[in-house]
């Protein structure tokens, strides 16, 4: 599984899969706060939280005494998937693009879960109107066949021909499937359909939220939605939100499966129910 390799695990925020490797993982990775509006890491939320988040990153990159070397790249998900379906604020993404350009740092956007119409656009970063330096994509592009693609700007193309060769790379059937998937998505306006169905699903989830206070935060883009389950009886955090109810999520997942609905879990303490329905 690609995501369990040494390099990929070094970039993962979740500690669980990383523990067995311990010191073998790269120590050249610096994690930064993500614009998690419902539980803002700066205790602010909204536009103020976004502003402080960007200021923190900009100061870290420009301060020679910050103790952090200028990175080769900044890697980000425009919508966090396993992290709990957290959509990055669009102004934050624009600010991130501005900061990385000014610093001469490549911006890599991970679209493996969010790409190919899932969020109502072909790629989730398009909602912010930015252009990354590198885009990593997989999953949906292969139409169920194994295919992963890295798209990057010309100035990053320093490999010599054959330098990235491998026995199972460049599979012709998977590439043909990928081309067919992209044609289908465009010809059948799947992006527009996913955006409309996502609005519909969000609307119905918010109706349920009125009667069930355990549905703390409903978020996402298009048909990549998440519901953060909370314990209304617990002590609120600095923003006034109840604590995550991680024990409830698998119970909800199990009951939904009994009724023919497949859901995934993610987020802190596994407390986010993830909706990733078919796009068609």
Model-derived features with residue positions:
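Conserved N-terminal phosphate-binding loop of PLP-dependent enzymes in the Aspartate aminotransferase
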Residues: 1-280
